[in-house]
Design a protein with these regions (language model features):
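Bacterial N-terminal signal peptides that target proteins for export
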Residues: 1-11
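Bacterial N-terminal signal peptides
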Residues: 9-20
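N-terminal leader/targeting and pre-domain segments
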Residues: 25-66
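Conserved helix-turn-beta segment immediately C-terminal to the redox Cys motif
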Residues: 63-70, 88-106
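Thiol-based oxidoreductase modules, predominantly thioredoxin-like and allied folds used
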Residues: 73-77, 100-114
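Conserved redox-active cysteine motifs that mediate thiol-disulfide chemistry
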Residues: 77-85
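Non-catalytic, surface beta->alpha helical segment in thiol-disulfide oxidoreductase systems
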Residues: 126, 132-160
Length: 160
């Protein structure tokens, strides 16, 4: 009788987990991505974008920045830190509305053994990682969690 109960419990657990995982939106979107594709495939990220309230003075500083900036964002669509902070980054770019600041997004797999091909030879240890380039030179990184806020950390890097 004991093994039968264990088997039923295990089957019940596996069925429940199997039903819940798709609801959580833990999809692996890999390689080059667009913001639009991320938000379409991970709709719960849209709520973070909508609710995030960036700091006004930092946004003003980003709006006024007058040199070309490229941000490479390495993210996992399955990763809670990516959901939180890449979504914040989306909102920051929206509000900064600076044509000189652009971003590219690279989706990284959950399986660490498969990640190196996506890192393009860059030293990426945690997700998300934002590599900030000004006029083609790397000026700094935001790794996993901003120190102050997404907008302030980005502005601090740009003003170095």
């Amino acid at each position: 009788m004991g093994p039968l109960i264990f088997s039923r419990s295990l089957i019940f657990f596996l069925v429940i987990v199997g039903l819940l995982l798709p609801v959580r939106g833990d999809t692996d979107m890999l390689g080059p991505l667009t913001r639009e594709a991320v938000l379409k495939n991970c709709p719960d990220w849209q709520e973070v974008v909508a609710l995030y309230q960036p700091d006004g003075p930092a946004i003003d500083g980003l709006q006024a920045f007058n040199r070309p900036v490229q941000v490479e964002v390495f993210l996992g669509t399955w990763c809670p830190d990516s959901k939180a902070h890449v979504s914040e980054f989306f909102k920051v770019l929206d509000l900064a509305d600076n044509a000189l600041i652009s971003a590219t997004y690279i989706g990284i797999p959950r399986d660490k053994a498969q990640r190196s091909e996506y890192y393009q030879g860059k030293d990426i240890q945690k997700l998300p990682t934002f590599l900030v380039f000004v006029e083609g030179q790397e000026k700094g990184r935001i790794i996993e969690v901003p120190l102050k806020s997404m907008e302030q950390d980005l502005l601090d890097i740009l003003l170095r």
